[in-house]
Design a protein with these regions (language model features):
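A short, N-terminal "cap"/entry segment at the start of jelly-roll beta-barrel domains
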Residues: 1-62, 114-115, 175
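Short histidine-centered beta-strand/loop micro-motifs
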Residues: 54-59, 76-82, 88-89, 134-136
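Conserved short histidine dyad/triad with adjacent acidic residue
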Residues: 64-86, 125-127
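Glycine- and acidic-residue-biased ligand/ion/polar-headgroup-sensing regions
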Residues: 72, 82-103
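Double-stranded beta-helix
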Residues: 101-118, 130-175
Length: 175
């Protein structure tokens, strides 16, 4: 991790440490977890939240913030964001946010302990880097993600052998 990227993650980490911010995020986690519980076939559910909830200055490239809840025991499969650099923090529970590409995954086990080192709680995923969350079977995993595009522009791309391009794309808010 470069010193510049560490500085960005530290700024985001600081923004998430206040009690009022954590309470707001917990309320979003509750809603998103309820959505996931209603959708028995879904592996994850999500909701963006306004950046102005964070009472501190964010790195200027941050354009959206999200809460994702990933189902216990799930492997959501490979995905990447062709238009955004993602920075993600484990908020509740734990999981392995693997990066790389199919057949050559690199493990990044993340925990939600606020006293754990930054590298054990955060991962930085550059634009177009394949990643896949693998969630522990004992509990759902709630994460906070920051992206470099506005919420309505965030694209998820997944492998799809049935398409000429070999992938399919969708916007998270278009689902």
């Amino acid at each position: 991790m470069t010193p510049e990227e560490r500085s960005r993650l530290e700024a985001l980490d600081t923004a998430l440490r206040s009690n009022s911010v954590r309470e707001h995020i917990r309320s979003v986690v509750v809603r998103v977890r309820e959505q996931l519980a209603r959708r028995k076939d879904a592996l994850m559910s999500w909701e963006p939240f306004p950046l102005d909830v964070l009472a501190t200055t964010l790195p200027p490239e941050i354009r959206s913030a999200w809460v994702f809840v990933l189902r216990a025991g799930a492997d959501t499969g490979a995905e990447r964001h062709p238009n955004s650099h993602q920075r993600m923090m484990s908020f509740e529970g734990s999981g392995d946010l693997q990066t790389g590409e199919p057949g050559r995954w690199q493990s990044n086990v993340l925990v939600s302990d606020p006293d754990a080192p930054l590298e054990r709680r955060w991962v930085s995923i550059r634009t177009n880097v394949w990643h896949r969350p693998v969630i522990d079977a004992s509990a759902d995993w709630a994460v906070v993600s920051f992206h470099t595009v506005p919420a309505e522009e965030l694209i998820e791309e997944r492998p799809d052998d049935s398409r000429e391009a070999g992938t399919r794309q969708m916007k998270y808010l278009g689902k």
